[in-house]
Amino acid sequence: WIMGHMVNAIEQVDEFLDLGANAIEFDIDFDKDGIAQITHHGIPCDCGRKCTKKAIFTEYLDNIRQVTTPDDPKFREQLVLLALDLKLQRISSAKAYRAGEDVAKKLLDHYWQRGNSRARAYILLNIPLVEDYEFIRAFKDTLKNEGYESYNDKVGINSAGNEDLDKIRDVLEILGIHKQVWQADGITSCFARGTERLKEALEKRDTPGYNYINKVYAWTLVRKSIMRRSLRLGVDGVMSNNPDRVIKVLKEKEFADKFRLATYNDNPWEKFRG
């Protein structure tokens, strides 16, 4: 999976898909009451990027629904995964449950259209800190209460805050989540980062019977040398400001026979058995 990073303006969706991304990440900004308002990162952000691009969240969902619906004029077959980077660290933890309710209802109304939409992308909820786990509980409670619990099959959880992996596992255990889990490791493209935690996550992913990590991705990669390093370690995905660079690396002799772009037929919740 090649995730286009910080795709917060509607016009950026096609831009990143044209560069080769098959997944996009966008930031969800909340008001003080936990209501999702806009797709927006803000300052600071990655080096060389404009931090202020944004869209109304519901309008963004309406557009991305079309982009991921077969036979729609806007349909782009390659886009199979949507990563919602939830900026919960900007609001009180006491509002995390309200935020989870709100995002679930907006996805129901504007993306899935309560069963009337054929939009098919998988959804990845990026939680910044495990202390915000009430968001996940609320999201799942809302799908159940609204009568659309089946959409859980399309939704995965990702911990994006570089926290202790065992601490993350403990919270997932509390929530009763033993599947559909991604693990991110990374840092803004402005800085270098070692591989110790990334290797630990990959080791846990590959441990038989360990159900708290199904996929691992590295972020935010812009240098080809770091992309190569991550691929050699065996990551499932790369988040980048430059998907075209990832495509070029994947075509290199060392990787061409080992990796390919994920399609809709690849289940993002299953561990890859090479």
From Swiss-Prot:
Tissue: Expressed by the venom gland.
EC numbers for this chain: 4.6.1.-
Residue numbers binding Mg(2+): E25, D27, D85
Disulfide bonds: C45-C51, C47-C190
Protein name: Dermonecrotic toxin SdSicTox-betaIIB1bxii
Keywords recorded for this protein, A-Z: Cytolysis, Dermonecrotic toxin, Disulfide bond, Hemolysis, Lipid degradation, Lipid metabolism, Lyase, Magnesium, Metal-binding, Secreted, Toxin
Gene Ontology biological-process entries: killing of cells of another organism; lipid catabolic process
Cofactor annotation remark: Binds 1 Mg(2+) ion per subunit.
Cofactor(s) the record lists: Mg(2+)
Location(s) in or outside the cell: Secreted
Regions crossing the membrane: none
GO molecular function: lyase activity; metal ion binding; phosphoric diester hydrolase activity; toxin activity
Family (UniProt): Belongs to the arthropod phospholipase D family. Class II subfamily.
Protein function: Dermonecrotic toxins cleave the phosphodiester linkage between the phosphate and headgroup of certain phospholipids (sphingolipid and lysolipid substrates), forming an alcohol (often choline) and a cyclic phosphate. This toxin acts on sphingomyelin (SM). It may also act on ceramide phosphoethanolamine (CPE), lysophosphatidylcholine (LPC) and lysophosphatidylethanolamine (LPE), but not on lysophosphatidylserine (LPS), and lysophosphatidylglycerol (LPG). It acts by transphosphatidylation, releasing exclusively cyclic phosphate products as second products.
Principal location listed in the UniProt entry: secreted
Active site: H5, H41 (nucleophile)
Coiled-coil intervals: none
Keyword flag Hydrolase: no
A GO CC term assigned to this protein in UniProt: extracellular region
Higher taxonomy: Eukaryota, Metazoa, Ecdysozoa, Arthropoda, Chelicerata
Catalytic activity: an N-(acyl)-sphingosylphosphocholine = an N-(acyl)-sphingosyl-1,3-cyclic phosphate + choline; an N-(acyl)-sphingosylphosphoethanolamine = an N-(acyl)-sphingosyl-1,3-cyclic phosphate + ethanolamine; a 1-acyl-sn-glycero-3-phosphocholine = a 1-acyl-sn-glycero-2,3-cyclic phosphate + choline; a 1-acyl-sn-glycero-3-phosphoethanolamine = a 1-acyl-sn-glycero-2,3-cyclic phosphate + ethanolamine
